[in-house]
């Protein structure tokens, strides 16, 4: 008799259905873990790789020495740099563009920079309404760096022992 009932349950997959419903019921009454994004924010790691920024030295001079290592190491070829020689025989960038539609946010540009000029910030909620809005130029990158310099410096200090 019991084997017939088991066979009936197995043939109609009722046992699996009951197991599935029990699992669903258990999670239905459990505590919710969903974060309602625009209203609630989760903590972001100091190592988060978000929007790029160009940094300056404390005296106001931009750090980039136009070595073009970041452009060479970028696997997506998202960085474009043009430079010129100055009178004191140092190079400075005249053009520094990052195409965020191509960028894969791998962080190679940040790792390869010898003067810590290009960094990736914690900013992840930016948008563009047109494709051209996501091409960040040198003044835009410097503005991001100037605005978030304190946070960038704190993140770099927190991560210093791992570099």
UniProtKB/Swiss-Prot annotation:
> Can you state the subunit structure given in the record?
NDH-1 is composed of 14 different subunits. Subunits NuoA, H, J, K, L, M, N constitute the membrane sector of the complex.
The chemistry this enzyme catalyses reads: a quinone + NADH + 5 H(+)(in) = a quinol + NAD(+) + 4 H(+)(out)
Which Gene Ontology BP terms does the record give?
aerobic respiration
Where in or outside the cell is it found? Cell inner membrane
- Please state the Enzyme Commission number of this protein: 7.1.1.-
Ranges for the 4Fe-4S ferredoxin-type domain? 54-84, 94-123
Name of the molecule in the record: NADH-quinone oxidoreductase subunit I
Say which family it is in. Belongs to the complex I 23 kDa subunit family.
Q: Which cofactor does it need?
A: [4Fe-4S] cluster
Q: How does it sit in the membrane?
A: Peripheral membrane protein
Q: What class of enzyme is it?
A: translocase
Q: Does the keyword Zinc apply?
A: no
The molecular function terms in GO held by this entry are:
4 iron, 4 sulfur cluster binding; iron ion binding; NADH:ubiquinone reductase (non-electrogenic) activity; quinone binding
Residues engaged in binding [4Fe-4S] cluster 1: 64, 67, 70, 113
Please name the Pfam families in this protein's record: Fer4_7 (PF12838)
């Amino acid at each position: 008799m019991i084997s017939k009932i088991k066979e009936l349950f197995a043939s109609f997959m009722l046992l699996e259905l009951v197991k599935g419903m029990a699992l669903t019921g258990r999670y239905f009454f459990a505590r919710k873990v969903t974060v309602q994004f625009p209203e609630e924010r989760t903590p972001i790691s100091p190592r988060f790789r978000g929007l790029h920024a160009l940094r300056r030295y404390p005296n106001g001079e931009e750090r980039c020495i136009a070595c073009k290592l970041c452009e060479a190491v970028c696997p997506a070829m998202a960085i474009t740099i043009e430079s010129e020689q100055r009178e004191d025989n140092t190079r400075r960038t005249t053009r520094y563009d990052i195409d965020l539609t191509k960028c894969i946010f791998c962080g190679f540009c940040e790792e390869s920079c010898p003067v810590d000029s290009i960094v990736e910030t914690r900013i992840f909620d930016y948008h563009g309404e047109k494709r051209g809005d996501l091409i960040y130029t040198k003044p835009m990158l410097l503005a991001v760096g100037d605005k978030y310099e304190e946070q960038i410096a704190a993140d770099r200090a927190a991560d210093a022992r791992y570099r």
